[in-house]
Design a protein with these regions (language model features):
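Hydrophobic, aliphatic-enriched repeat segments that assemble into extended interaction scaffolds
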Residues: 1-17, 120-121, 169-183, 266-282
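Structural signature of Gram-negative outer-membrane beta-barrels, strongest in the C-terminal barrel
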Residues: 1-132, 182, 223-225, 229
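Gram-negative outer-membrane beta-barrel transporters
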Residues: 9-10, 129-131, 153-247, 323-325
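Solvent-exposed loop segments that connect transmembrane elements
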Residues: 13-52, 94-98, 137-151, 189-209, ...
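Conserved C-terminal beta-signal and adjacent last beta-strands/turns
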Residues: 61, 67, 74, 105-112, ...
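Membrane-embedded beta-barrel scaffold of Gram-negative outer-membrane proteins
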Residues: 72-81, 104-161, 166, 170-176, ...
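Hydrophobic pocket-lining residues within nucleotide cofactor-binding pockets
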Residues: 84, 186, 281
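Switch/connector loops and helix/strand junctions flanking conserved nucleotide-binding motifs
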Residues: 87, 134, 284-287
């Protein structure tokens, strides 16, 4: 059994401008004008001032781990961790949270499973639950088909239930293999936002219970390594990322893909090391990440964008890199 804890004092003091930005924005007094029913122009005075925000808080964390051997090689394992923190100063970018929205972020993790060890394999298989409450995000919502965007403050939760099996394998001398398989389902909770654009049209996004964007549900890792000599080794790395959603409402997605790497490392002597590595061995092509400006697109509207060009990130092309390290 292993257990531990941490207590952290957190103080934040800053000057906050909570007013949204607009054309001609400036600190101090300004007027807005409207036309009354009788045709006269009515001026309304406003003032923008920085207000001090000071927080004195305690963040805490605790962990407990249990391991029980049923035999010399086989056993059960479980652990639980909880960590908390209050919003950081960086999360006050834009309008920032109000006093009512300033809440403790809580991250609990619970997992348990089995393990098996012998002379050539170290195997574990575990089920994991993890969540995060009161996550703060400044989300830019772009009106589909235009460049007009509005930034809104979102406070939501994320939770994940997953299963991971990993193995460290040494079947013969000088060879090592790391293997991992993960199936997970990370979903948004309480994720709702709406925005009104300059033409008066209101649009909303509801990602509640939808898969978190950019996070695949299936992950596979295969990492073989062979020591040719004491100072020379060759390695490969294969990563599979399953289908990932490119926007909040599961309307757009990228198919699963492999990312492959390999190389040779040579420690020439105590002061010099050389290496060569290959990225994207099979020169697989495709896109990944998110699609900018797509957050308000729904599943029903996705068909309208078939065959259209949209911006995102791409898989790194086939690349060969040479490296050298010198120690003085």
């Amino acid at each position: 059994m292993f257990y531990g804890g941490r207590l952290e004092y957190y103080r934040m003091s800053a000057e906050q401008i909570s007013a949204p930005r607009f054309s001609g924005f400036h600190m101090g007094n300004y007027n807005t004008y409207a036309t009354a029913a009788d045709g006269s122009v009515v001026a309304t005075e406003h003032s923008i001032e920085a207000k001090n925000v000071t927080k004195d808080k305690l963040n805490y964390a605790a962990t407990l781990q249990l391991t029980y051997n049923l035999t010399r090689q086989f056993g059960l394992t479980a652990d639980a961790t909880i960590a908390t923190r209050f919003p950081r100063i960086s999360e006050y970018a834009g309008t920032g949270p109000t006093e009512e929205q300033y809440k403790r972020v809580t991250i609990p993790l619970i997992r348990g499973g089995i393990f098996y060890k012998n002379d050539w394999i170290d195997l574990s298989s575990m089920v994991t639950y993890i969540s995060k409450s009161n996550n703060i995000d400044q989300q830019n919502l772009t009106k589909p088909g235009t460049t007009e965007g509005k930034t809104v403050l979102l406070i939501y939760n994320i939770q994940t239930l997953g299963w991971t099996t990993s193995a460290e394998i040494n079947p013969f001398k000088n060879f090592h293999m790391h293997a991992l398989f993960t199936y997970q389902k990370p979903v948004y909770k309480n994720y709702n936002a709406s925005v009104t654009f300059s033409d008066g049209q209101s649009m909303g996004v509801n990602a509640n219970n939808m898969i978190v964007k950019e996070i695949p549900q299936v992950l596979i890792e295969l990492d073989p390594k062979y020591d040719i000599t004491k100072n020379l080794n060759a390695w490969l790395s294969f990563r599979y990322f399953g289908k990932t959603y490119a926007n909040l409402q599961e309307a757009l997605y990228f198919n699963g893909h492999w990312e492959t790497f390999g190389g040779i490392n040579w420690n020439v002597n105590k002061k010099l090391s050389l290496g060569v590595s290959v990225i994207n061995i099979f020169n697989e092509k495709g896109a990944k990440g998110t699609i900018s400006g797509s957050e308000l697109i729904t599943k029903q509207e996705a068909g309208k964008y078939d065959g259209k060009y949209m911006s995102g990130s791409y898989l790194r092309p086939f690349t060969v890199e040479f490296s050298a390290g010198i120690k003085f």
